Amino acid sequence: MALARAAGCILSFDPNLRPPLWDDLEQARDQIHWGLAQCDVAKISDDELLFLTGETDFDAGAAKLIAQFPNLQIVNVTAGAQGSISYYQGLRVFQPGVTLGGVIETTGAGDTFCACVLNFLLEHGLEHLTADDLTQMLRFANAAAYLVTTRRGAIRSMPEPEQVLALL
């Protein structure tokens, strides 16, 4: 992580918490805290936000994370079909999820969301993002994540950019 930071890389973290895989949830919390302390960009699900902060209110939970981990430049909170919220330098941008039906399974949706966010940030950078930029980022990421849920299998279900744009 130190080498990546020194090289100017954007560091991202998605805890992808799976409680049954941990013998001790406090150890999971400690490891997630370590990851959050290392990264610039965090993707946190609604359930993970509750686990980490005790907050059901997304704004309050994100504020706690940003206060606790000042290195975080962007916190993206995802809530499945309900949509996602991006918190960046005092901005709060909500983008509704895509709810066209046809969901088969949700495997890979969060990973797809993350990949789209990271692609956007690699193209646009982390500095001077606007609310419109964040809206564009979330809109594309939500649409791509939705498309993954309409297909079986995480890897082969990843949509091409043109497929996402056609949905939008």
Regions found by a protein language model. Give the residues of each.
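Conserved phosphate-binding/catalytic region of the ribokinase-like
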Residues: 2-3, 55-168
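Conserved beta-alpha-beta core of the PfkB/ribokinase-like small-molecule kinase fold
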Residues: 1-63, 82
